């Protein structure tokens, strides 16, 4: 299950941002998860809930925004947002498409609480 290594890297990134901003804890983690990222949202949530128990993210809520697949057709220049995992242009049925969005997982926003003086 590669979700564990992904969550480990995500929590490390959160910790770096918290340290840079002198935060005592992180209360919310917002990510964008592409449908073609190869990451299963429910497994990612379970892995996050497991890994967050120790450290600065232990009180954090993980919010996952699913990003649909967005393609650009190289033949008809049509840009399409697709709900299915296909790379076929719905306008002209061409396979000559380029993925614009929906393949990645991105950390979008953190909600942090500052250290008390």
Swiss-Prot record:
GO terms for molecular function: nickel cation binding; zinc ion binding. Keywords: Metal-binding, Nickel, Zinc. The keyword Zinc applies. It comes from the Bacteria. Zn(2+) binds at residues 73, 76, 89, 92. It holds the Pfam family HypA. Belongs to the HypA/HybF family. HAMAP family: HypA_HybF (MF_00213). This is Hydrogenase maturation factor HypA. It comes from Shewanella baltica (strain OS155 / ATCC BAA-1091). The gene is hypA.
């Amino acid at each position: 299950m590669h979700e564990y290594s992904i969550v480990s890297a995500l929590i490390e990134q959160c910790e770096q941002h918290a340290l840079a901003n002198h935060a005592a804890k992180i209360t919310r983690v917002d990510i964008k998860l592409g449908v073609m990222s190869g990451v299963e949202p429910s497994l990612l949530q379970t892995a996050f809930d497991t890994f967050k128990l120790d450290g600065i993210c232990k009180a954090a809520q993980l919010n996952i925004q699913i990003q649909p697949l967005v393609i650009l057709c190289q033949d008809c220049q049509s840009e399409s947002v697709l709900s299915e995992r296909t790379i076929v242009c719905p306008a002209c049925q061409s396979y000559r498409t380029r993925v614009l969005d929906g393949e990645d997982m991105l950390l979008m926003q953190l909600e942090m609480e500052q250290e008390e003086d």
